[in-house]
Amino acid sequence: MKRWYVVHAYSGFEKSVAQALRDRISRIEIQDRFGDVLVPAEEVVEMRSGQKRRSEHKFFPGYVLIQIETYYEGGVPRIDNECWHLVKETPKVMGFIGGTADRPLPISSDEADAILRRVQDGAEKPRPKVLFEPGQMVRVIDGPFNDFDGLVEEVNYEKNRLRVAVLIFGRPTPVDLEFGQVQKS
């Protein structure tokens, strides 16, 4: 049975560590003892220079998840020495998280399912990088109401838009804006 283990990698090198693990696994031809290698992340959408940009936000910077064939020794989950050495000797890997240095423990099935669900949700619906709440003060930074301050009345994450009450001639006037047209005050 394959279980998920957490590997501590140098921060910023998670993707290269994941690729190195995949390469080493296929080179040694022990794919049957490994499953997925995953850098848990979600896609976020932000506005830069009036353009929507998609970027990736890692849930756990510095960590890589890997599925490894697990057997039980006295009721305790274990991985074989060859798998352990393959992971530990991968460049930019600092070790396993959980258990002891030479006897790592897998994360629970519930934790693994929650992480995988979160990754799936992030892939299906990219979320905005900046979150807004009704009642929050914002400053308009783009469009005809540039440099006006306003109060967020309504937020629509599906369309990446919000309704802001902007003071025009001393009266609050609702204006529909994109997330990229405002910044938090």
Swiss-Prot record:
Pfam families: KOW, NusG. The keyword Transcription applies. One of its GO terms (biological process) is transcription antitermination. GO terms for cellular component: cytosol. Disulfide bonds: none annotated. Participates in transcription elongation, termination and antitermination. The gene is nusG. Belongs to the NusG family. InterPro entries: KOW, NGN, NGN-like_dom, NGN_dom_sf, NusG-like, Rib_uL2_dom2, Transcrpt_antiterm_NusG, Transcrpt_antiterm_NusG_bac_CS. Residues 134-162 form the KOW domain. This is Transcription termination/antitermination protein NusG. It comes from Xylella fastidiosa (strain 9a5c).
